[in-house]
């Protein structure tokens, strides 16, 4: 199944998307986390979802992949702008509504979209994500992850092999104990990322993201059926964040993946695809 590339215009912004499957099927929009392009929604993962009877769309957030990028170190948009980009993609595909599936930051964007535009959101699935709120009592990111990425400033970004090694290492440190780290596949995806990115360094602009604070504490207003998928060894958003999400969003369901990290490991694809598919289809049947 070869994905079809399509660029969506939103004012002076270009959003690069790819779609899999039959456009007549219910749409699933995949939203990746901070600093990562749509490449990290592995094409085979997308195909498996499409084979379940969905029209699957993945896209590059601003400052990643082939979408509009800005000079490194500058902030030109807010978190709410990224949430509105979700709607722009849906409008570009003439979708009145869609199932939203977000990884990490993508899961928070799904929450924002569900709060702001409830009529456009059929369901939300949040993978390795956290509640859109300032929950200082919840455990933070593992210091080892921060220490690893602090080395990015010393990296020779002109040396492609070193850059790929850095990207692979960044995913390795997020891997849980459930499965061995899939270095071969991760390296292939990193190579693809490097080849297709307009400006790789612009991904770090996501560290300047602000905006949407006025929506803190409103995730309990979400009416869309919500599914939470979270590993018990997540080093970015520890498992307590999943429990907080489940407690906050009414009638949400939690799929706990024991030993999984901040990742969508290939050996867990069947489990995750089944959970997303069942969640979306149950909602259609309920309606």
Name every feature range the model reports, one short phrase each:
Residues 123-157:
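Flexible "cap/lid" loop of the alpha/beta hydrolase fold
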Residues 222, 228-230:
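Short beta-strand/loop motif that positions the catalytic acidic residue
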Residues 235-241:
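Conserved alpha/beta-hydrolase "acid-adjacent" motif
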Residues 144-217, 224, 244:
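Alpha/beta-hydrolase
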Residues 80-98:
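Conserved acidic catalytic loop of the alpha/beta-hydrolase fold
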Residues 252-287:
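Catalytic active-site module of serine/aspartate enzymes centered on a nucleophile-bearing elbow/loop
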Residues 13-69:
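Conserved HGGG/HGGXW glycine-rich cap/lid loop of the alpha/beta-hydrolase fold
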Residues 107-118, 124:
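Short glycine-enriched nucleophile-adjacent loop
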């Amino acid at each position: 199944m070869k994905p079809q590339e399509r660029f969506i215009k939103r004012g002076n912004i270009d959003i690069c998307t790819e779609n899999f499957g039959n456009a007549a099927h219910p749409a699933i929009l995949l939203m990746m986390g901070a600093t990562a392009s749509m490449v990290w929604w592995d094409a085979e993962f997308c195909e498996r979802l499409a084979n379940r009877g969905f029209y699957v769309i993945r896209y590059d957030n601003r400052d990643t992949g082939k979408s509009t990028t800005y000079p490194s170190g500058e902030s030109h948009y807010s978190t709410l702008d990224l949430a509105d980009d979700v709607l722009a993609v849906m409008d570009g595909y003439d979708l009145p509504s869609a199932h939203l599936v977000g990884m990490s930051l993508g899961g928070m964007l799904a929450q924002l979209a569900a709060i702001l535009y409830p009529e456009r959101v059929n369901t939300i699935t949040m993978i390795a994500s956290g509640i859109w709120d300032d929950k200082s009592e919840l455990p933070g990111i593992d210091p080892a992850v921060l220490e690893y990425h602090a080395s990015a400033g010393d990296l020779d970004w002109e040396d492609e092999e070193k850059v790929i090694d850095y990207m692979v290492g960044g995913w390795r440190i997020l891997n849980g104990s459930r499965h061995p780290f899939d270095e071969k596949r991760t390296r292939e995806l990193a190579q693809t990322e490097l080849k297709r990115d307009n400006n790789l360094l612009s991904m770090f602009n996501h560290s300047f993201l602000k905006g949407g604070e006025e929506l803190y504490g409103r995730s309990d207003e979400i009416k869309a059926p919500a599914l939470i998928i979270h590993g018990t060894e997540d080093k970015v958003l520890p498992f307590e964040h999943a429990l907080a999400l489940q407690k906050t969003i009414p009638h949400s369901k939690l799929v706990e993946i024991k030993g999984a990290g901040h990742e969508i490991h290939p050996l867990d694809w069947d489990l995750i695809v089944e959970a997303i598919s069942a969640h979306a289809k149950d909602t259609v049947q309920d309606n």
